[in-house]
Amino acid sequence: MRYHPHTPDDVRAMLDVVGAERVDDLFRSIPQALRLDRPLDLPPAADEIALFSELRRLAARNETAHPPFVGAGCYPHHVPPVVDQLLLRGEFFTAYTPYQPEISQGTLQALFEWQTFVCLLTGMDVSNASMYDGATATAEAALMAGRITGRDKVVVSAALHPEYRKVLATYLRSTGDEIVTVPFGADGRTDLAALAQAVDGRTACVILGYPNFLGVVDALPEAAALARAAGALTVAATAEAVSLGLLQAPGALGADVAVGTFQSFGNPMSFGGPAPGFFATREKSLRQMPGRVAGATVDKQGRRGFVLTLSTREQHIRREKATSNICTNSGLCALASTIHLSLLGKRGLAELARLNHGRARMLRDAMERAGCRPVFSGPYFNEQVFDVGDAEAVVAKLAKRGIVAGAPLARWYPDAPHAKGALLCAATELHGPELIQLFASTVRS
């Protein structure tokens, strides 16, 4: 069956409107020598059975692997099948927030529940309806801090995700704001003495990872105290959101803004994305928050309803008054996270977080028995750096065994301690005891 949307009469009518005799006349600007004057060399059309057979043949060429031990900002977690089934419902299956949002009460309620989950896990007062990802959420936090404080300097921990820092630099290139990077110490935490020297009266905000890129739970309370004393805001960026089921909420530790990604809830790794970014802050900063907010209200009949409010995007108001130019957010990915968190509940999330930390401890014990000691001494959640001697060689060796190992740290930190051997590894609920032992024994051999 051929799928031609236009009848000959449709084509003739359109050509008449533009004053052309033939379809070829539309391409007169292209030199004749560059035009294809024959049909495309394609194989005959396949029926459905033959097509699926060919797809299975191609899929068989892929190498299957165990759950990867690589994290570095994107983590392997179990996604309950019901998440995808609910996402496929026609009412939800779009990344877009409708231009007439009030007619899509289900979508707005889902975003409202997302905001509720974000606030509960971060200890903040308000959340928006999602961001593109953790990196852009972090950059938007720096822009918001500049608007609030009127300052032009951002102090960033070197242990913040390096790719978050790259996106931040891209955003601030046009504003002219200065970025000062503070080193981390032997424990993998931000060097507080260096941070104290870097923070001054020009500082708009201090940004730390929580946990940071090295897997270490950074010194957020101490950093927040230093920032507060200088009149600056503190931004906590979380790439592994399962940690918030075990760690204290960033808001409880003094952070003014909490950002990051909920990829770990309901969203597969998918070669690094997409994944929903989150942005939460104190109520006093509500009107400076980027994006848009789903709010609850009551109509004339006293019925509860949901609306989009505080949409201070440049699509809605004057550019000079806008807080961001974010367009389509990650609504569908945010819905996946909302469904997953609803299924887990408070107790389930706590159990999942404890299980992740337990598997990380199991990995640490196994790696130490294999002669691979941890590089950093600071507290960790489910990710840590080990000295394996030659990280690149270990990754290549394990790949032959069907194991995707961790990420060689030298890719981002060539001058870090034990850089050549430093391997960043994550362990989640998907990494059972047998797989962890296989990983460690293969590294040792």
Curated annotation (Swiss-Prot):
Keyword Nucleus in record: no
Pfam families from the UniProt entry: GDC-P
The entry's keywords: Oxidoreductase
Single GO MF descriptor: glycine dehydrogenase (decarboxylating) activity
Reaction catalyzed: N(6)-[(R)-lipoyl]-L-lysyl-[glycine-cleavage complex H protein] + glycine + H(+) = N(6)-[(R)-S(8)-aminomethyldihydrolipoyl]-L-lysyl-[glycine-cleavage complex H protein] + CO2
Superkingdom of origin organism: Bacteria
TM stretches of this protein: none
EC number from the UniProt entry: 1.4.4.2
Biological process annotations from GO: glycine decarboxylation via glycine cleavage system; nucleoside metabolic process
Entry's family note: Belongs to the GcvP family. N-terminal subunit subfamily.
PANTHER family assigned to the protein according to its UniProt record, in alphabetical order: GLYCINE CLEAVAGE SYSTEM P-PROTEIN, GLYCINE DEHYDROGENASE (DECARBOXYLATING)
Assembly and interaction partners: The glycine cleavage system is composed of four proteins: P, T, L and H. In this organism, the P 'protein' is a heterodimer of two subunits.
Free-text function comment from the UniProt entry: The glycine cleavage system catalyzes the degradation of glycine. The P protein binds the alpha-amino group of glycine through its pyridoxal phosphate cofactor; CO(2) is released and the remaining methylamine moiety is then transferred to the lipoamide cofactor of the H protein.
Name by which UniProt lists this protein: Probable glycine dehydrogenase (decarboxylating) subunit 1
